[in-house]
């Protein structure tokens, strides 16, 4: 019975491993425990076997028009003895291409394949691997398998391929709307020889239920992770899931396969074990479980005696969440609740590297992870927490340590945007509980800066002396170790307007007057005059003017209000919307003419691109967003179009670059690194660090100071200290530069200043 019922395939982890005990003793009980999913006993120590790492590897990426051709080709590729074959369909590929974090890794793709097979080979030499990959390529062509085969031995190129494969699952879950690719039949395994027919039959079942599926997995061993797209928020969706699962279990049984080739039975697949193994073997499973665990304490309800699939659902037919009015546009996710529900619980936000999630990295507390906050919001919205929780102090405490870095927006494979959710939460919270004075002050930092500049240098003395510091601590709760930026008497606006007189002053970065380079086409740009550039750091604006004019461009200074970022961060969405409308009114005429808006401060300029279309929701906002660029981004756009000639000398400089979190989330770091490398004498390195920990006003607030500095100590501060003083630190964000100075004692300058140093 066991020999007849157990699948004769490479991958089978369903049920208990009774087939390992058909021969006479001695028995190796390890084989019984492995795969038992904690239902039999607790493992306290393990002795494992190690195998040598391969000397070298190479990849062949075979492109197909559809998933069926890819599945059919597997048996012919196995003849070439690859170390592995991975399969990905167009759902994974297209989401990877659209992903901010993964889009740059897609250079290995030719055309728009419906599916690819990633074939890996081990070897001892380049020649051996070249021979293996070329033979496969020739064989694929002779058999008309696929339309392209890309071979690669370069490690970086291979890493790009594996990055796409690794993040495939999360990207699939980033599908917007209630229907998601769900893992209720996603671990089937069959003989690779039969994979082509199996995939066709699987697809027929799914399409007969008026839906589709996403495919990826380990094709070389016949284990496919196929996820039908289903919504479980209505009964017909739950019924569809049950019907598909029932038919797929029949299909797997017919093909002599296993419902689980890798992930185990758990709750989802355990319910089918009596059907798959028969009542006699299922009874043996129950007896085995009872012998090891007579009291049923060890992970109950898994493998055997499993509850029905439609119990214990995160969402179900009785799930509901209110349609909460919002200031930002959540229509891409249906509504606010839909954006919260984008979190599928994978927990990638609990990583210890990257930008996401700085508060979790520093606290190691689930509550302060993206997943923890999303779960609390979902529970509050759906009524699982007491009424009024959405505007409660307790939920505010959970949201408070979110630094609004947007790291989750790009690094969470599901695209959870906790910063956006926090903005809306704070808006609702303030409406119910009032707006604290400190929030009002920080949100309106632009107005404060106007008066600070008019009264400079007296204003600087007032805020830096002991009395001023004490007042800022008592009234605004600013930590005593934080230094506010100094105000300047001559604002950037005053300096810029003075250039229109008979003897206009040059930028201190200009060398010998304006550059002679020309730009084909539009020769005018609008420089966004942000708050900090205008009232605190006009040298950044002067550097930007020098660079843009050296590139042959005429610079016009914007007459805009504050971008609204401080208001958004503090949840004052009405105030932010008013500023957005005003700025769009002022800049739309330029956008209509194709005159670019250039920004130097990432948090300001990227507000135009990210939040403005969501706040104002009209075509003018979209037009302004499309017409707005960071200065490095714009320079490289000209460079790539062959329109930039910048006279940069051979000044030698070592530059260490730290990117702003919003920059990393919205546009990446490639343009900044490329812009700095325009200077031929510059040696440039990117700091591999996450959030700096300052996050605007967050790090100034006394209750956040320790956490802010701890985040900086995770990677940024040590990376800077590890470099000699002859390395200059370049940072785009104003709060990031302040954090670098406070944490390391090193002065950081803006990218525009550092690059302008090289102007001839």
What role is predicted for each listed range?
Residues 6-21, 86-102, 150-167, 216-229, ...:
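A glycine-rich phosphate-binding loop feature that marks nucleotide/adenosyl-phosphate handling sites
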């Amino acid at each position: 019975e066991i020999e007849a019922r157990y699948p004769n395939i490479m991958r089978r982890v369903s049920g208990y491993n009774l087939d390992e005990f058909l021969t006479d003793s001695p028995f190796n009980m390890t084989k019984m425990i492995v795969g038992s999913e904690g239902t039999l006993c607790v493992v306290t120590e393990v002795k494992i076997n190690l195998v040598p790492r391969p000397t070298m590897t190479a990849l062949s990426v075979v492109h197909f028009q559809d998933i069926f051709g890819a599945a059919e080709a597997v048996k012919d590729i196995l003849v070439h003895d690859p170390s592995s074959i991975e399969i990905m369909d167009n759902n994974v590929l297209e989401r990877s291409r659209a992903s901010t974090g993964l889009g740059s890794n897609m250079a290995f793709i030719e055309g728009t394949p419906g599916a690819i097979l990633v074939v890996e080979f081990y070897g001892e030499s380049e020649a051996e691997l070249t021979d293996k990959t070329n033979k496969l390529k020739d064989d694929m062509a002779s058999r008309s398998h696929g339309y392209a085969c890309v071979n690669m031995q370069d490690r970086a190129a291979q890493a790009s391929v594996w990055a796409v494969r690794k993040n495939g699952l999360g990207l699939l879950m980033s599908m917007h709307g209630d229907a998601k690719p769900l893992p209720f039949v996603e671990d089937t395994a069959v003989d690779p020889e039969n994979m082509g027919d199996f995939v066709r039959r699987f697809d027929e079942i799914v399409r007969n239920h008026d839906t589709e599926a996403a495919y990826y997995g380990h094709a070389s061993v016949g284990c496919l992770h196929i996820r039908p797209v289903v919504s479980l928020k209505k009964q017909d969706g739950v019924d569809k899931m049950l019907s598909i699962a029932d038919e797929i279990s029949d299909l797997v049984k017919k093909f002599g396969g296993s419902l689980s080739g890798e992930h185990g039975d758990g709750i989802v697949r355990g319910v089918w074990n009596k059907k798959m193994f028969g009542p006699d073997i299922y009874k043996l499973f129950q007896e085995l479980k009872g012998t090891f665990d007579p009291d049923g304490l060890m992970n109950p309800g898994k493998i055997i005696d499993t509850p029905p699939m439609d119990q214990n659902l995160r969402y179900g037919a009785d799930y509901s969440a209110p349609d909460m009015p919002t200031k930002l546009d959540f229509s891409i996710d249906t509504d606010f609740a839909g954006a919260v529900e984008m979190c599928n619980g994978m927990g990638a936000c609990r990583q210890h590297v990257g930008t996401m999630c700085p508060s979790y990295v520093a606290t190691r507390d689930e509550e302060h992870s993206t997943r923890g906050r999303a779960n609390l919001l979902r529970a509050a919205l759906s009524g699982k927490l007491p009424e009024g929780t959405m505007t409660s102090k307790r939920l505010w405490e959970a949201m408070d340590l979110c630094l609004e870095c947007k790291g989750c927006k790009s690094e969470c494979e599901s695209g959870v945007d906790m910063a956006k959710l926090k903005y809306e939460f704070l808006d609702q919270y303030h409406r119910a509980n009032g707006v604290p004075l400190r929030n009002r002050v920080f949100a309106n930092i632009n107005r404060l800066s106007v008066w600070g500049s008019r009264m400079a240098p007296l204003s600087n003395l007032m805020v830096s002396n002991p009395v001023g510091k004490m007042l800022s601590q008592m009234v605004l709760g600013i930590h005593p170790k934080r230094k506010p930026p100094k105000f300047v008497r001559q604002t950037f606006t005053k300096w810029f307007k003075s250039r229109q007189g008979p003897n206009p002053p040059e930028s201190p970065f200009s060398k010998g007057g304006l550059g002679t380079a020309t730009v084909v086409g539009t020769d005018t740009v609008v420089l966004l005059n942000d708050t900090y550039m205008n009232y605190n750091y006009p040298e950044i604006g002067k550097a930007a003017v020098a660079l843009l004019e050296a590139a042959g461009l005429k610079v016009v200074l914007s007459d805009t209000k504050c971008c609204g970022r401080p208001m958004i961060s503090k949840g004052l969405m009405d105030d932010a919307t008013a500023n957005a409308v005003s700025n769009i009114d002022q800049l739309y005429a330029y956008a209509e003419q194709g005159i670019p808006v250039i920004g130097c401060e990432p948090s300001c300029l990227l507000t135009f691109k990210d939040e403005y279309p969501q706040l104002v929701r009209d075509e003018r906002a979209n037009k302004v967003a499309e017409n707005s660029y960071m200065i490095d981004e714009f320079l490289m756009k000209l460079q790539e179009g062959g329109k930039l000639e910048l006279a940069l000398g051979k000044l030698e400089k070592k530059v260490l670059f730290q990117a702003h979190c919003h920059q990393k989330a919205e546009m990446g770091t490639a343009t900044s690194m490329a812009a700095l490398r325009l200077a031929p004498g510059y040696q440039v390195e990117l700091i591999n660090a996450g959030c700096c920990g300052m996050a605007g006003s967050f790090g100034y607030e006394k209750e956040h100071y320790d956490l802010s500095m701890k985040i900086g100590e995770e990677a940024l501060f040590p990376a800077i200290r590890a470099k000699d003083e002859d390395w200059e630190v370049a940072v785009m964000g104003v709060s990031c530069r302040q954090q670098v100075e406070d944490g390391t004692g090193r002065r950081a300058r803006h990218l525009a200043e550092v690059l302008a140093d090289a102007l001839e």
